[in-house]
């Protein structure tokens, strides 16, 4: 069923934290959800932003496959530890009021700040690669952890 409503859950990938099965503000695992700047993320018992190290752990301990899932492109991220998986949609980013790179790239915030004019660390993903970079001043996707 396309875009089926699912309950937000935290998936055990065998890592140090559990990862939400959908982006913050989404109603299904393939929806882009909210786009937020680092200082706009306000969470409580729902979870929290992952740290840079937790995002690196996700990169290093999971297999990443670029897929088209019900018309949405992104990565299926499958744990090498227990086989569980999450989908990270290529939601692009927001600059001002305009969306860029939707369906082509994904940008996911972390809670790790760096001493630079740019600020927070983020995961950037495209069909050819994925890795950690310094975030600019744009609004990005948020995937919570517990």
PLM feature segments, named:
Residues 5-7, 12, 17-48, 52-146:
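C-terminal, surface-exposed recognition/capping segments
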């Amino acid at each position: 069923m396309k875009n089926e409503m699912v309950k937000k859950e935290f998936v055990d990938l065998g890592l140090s934290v559990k990862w939400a099965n959908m982006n913050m503000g989404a109603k299904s695992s393939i929806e882009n959800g909210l786009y937020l700047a680092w200082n706009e993320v306000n969470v409580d018992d729902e979870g929290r932003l992952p740290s840079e190290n937790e995002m690196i752990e996700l990169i290093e301990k999971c297999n990443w496959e670029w897929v088209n899932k019900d018309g949405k492109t992104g990565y299926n991220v499958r744990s090498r530890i227990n086989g569980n998986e999450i989908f990270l949609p290529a939601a692009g980013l927001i600059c001002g009021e305009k969306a860029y790179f939707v369906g082509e790239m994904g940008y996911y915030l972390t809670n790790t700040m760096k001493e630079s004019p740019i600020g927070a660390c983020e995961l950037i993903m495209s069909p050819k690669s994925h890795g950690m970079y310094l975030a600019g001043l744009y609004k990005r996707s948020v995937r919570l952890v517990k």
